[in-house]
UniProtKB/Swiss-Prot annotation:
It comes from Arabidopsis thaliana. Its EC number is 1.8.-.-. NADP(+) binds at G220, C221, S222, M223, S224, G225. FAD binds at G20, A21, G22, P23, S24, G25. The keyword NADP applies. PANTHER family: DIMETHYLANILINE MONOOXYGENASE. The lineage of its organism: Eukaryota, Viridiplantae, Streptophyta, Embryophyta, Tracheophyta. It comes from the Eukaryota. This is Flavin-containing monooxygenase FMO GS-OX-like 8. The keyword Protein biosynthesis does not apply. SUPFAM superfamilies: FAD/NAD(P)-binding domain. Interacts with EER5. Transmembrane segments: none annotated. Catalyzes the conversion of methylthioalkyl glucosinolates of any chain length into methylsulfinylalkyl glucosinolates. Belongs to the FMO family.
Amino acid sequence: MVLVITEPIKSQSKTVCVIGAGPSGLVSARELKKEGHKVVVMEQNHDVGGQWLYQPNVDEEDTLGKTKTLKVHSSVYSSLRLASPREVMGFSDFPFIAKEGRDSRRFPGHEELLLYLKDFCQVFGLREMIRFNVRVEFVGMVNEDDDDDDDVKKWMVKSVKKSGEVMEEVFDAVVVASGHYSYPRLPTIKGMDLWKRKQLHSHIYRVPEPFCDEVVVVVGCSMSGQDISIELVEVAKEVHLSTKSLDIPPGLSKVIEKHQNLHLHPQIESLEEDGRVIFEDGSCIVADTILYCTGYEYKFPFLESKGRVEIDDNRVGPLFEHTFSPSLSPFLSFVGIPRKLIGFPFFESQAKWIAKLLSGKTSLPSSDQMMQSISDFYLAREADGIPKRNTHDIADFNYSDKYADYIGFPHLEEWRKVLCLSAILNSIENLETYRDSWDDDDLLQETLQDPYFTQLSIPSV
């Protein structure tokens, strides 16, 4: 398909509201600032970091996260460590290097990544643009009754301060960078609503001690399900891991063989009022707690787009390249929606594209062409057997390079791809130890000689 690029918008400074001060919001603010736009970042918490701003206190009254407005944004648990080596995670001009007196591990804890984001914020002077303790309640078009897709839309943003003060402001553009690891995605299980014992989603899991001597069923074999199960076996009486497929990777098999109180099961058939959990193979246990590690929903409860951006089975769309609503671009955009890629460099390429579009330095295809591209993408995913709910799961380094080509952003360095793949393969084989034991030292030493680490002028903090 040949895309015909439309005329750029007029070059002038725009007023832009960025929603969220996590990694995607911070890099968006940085790129917009570089292009001379007037930026306001609205952040509901007291500091930067987004998901990486650990919140030890959870909502005990809403253990499954069913309320429209969650009290707690972060889903990070106390022991969480990065699943990718720090070398691959930094932005293009700000390596995530170890610093004296801090967590220097290759796979550091969440606290270290938060400090990296705070350093990034300080070095590039972003804090002055951020309003903390401000929750965005509404985003909608000012001229919403005008159905002309080519008309420039302005956006009303209604926000509420922690004090209760309500503000209404108009912006030229809005960048949604509010994350997607806060609203629990729950399975549908027979008897789930009638089960009287403790049920919670991993969104509110923080430490293992409350589960001491319990029989715990962990539903879901994703990264969090595996990590939390490994942690729980040290304190729980029994841990029963329920998964869609019993064809598990070697690393998880080793963990199960090592821990006699960790058991693997198929999916749950039903939950009984007397505490029994019946699995699809007919086996049954009596549990104290069910912990759902079943992922998260994309939700933007503040956004009113008149149906132009909707969420259907966790597909946010239609979005051109997971970023732009064809009929509202470039004045409404999303940063950070794709998953299963090297996140920070990708967020940066998204932010650069948005900032340059708003400056009039580049253009998008026509609305019709973007819609056709989206349709072609959906059909290709369907042909590959990828469920709609996994629309934004990329798992393809080449996609990041293709995306970068839109704005002339450099491709992912080969060492990033190699180190990331090495970590993935090591985790498959050695789930319990891969963060502390690896066999790619030769690759690592070669990587650390790259100009990214040796020649880049890294501002001090």
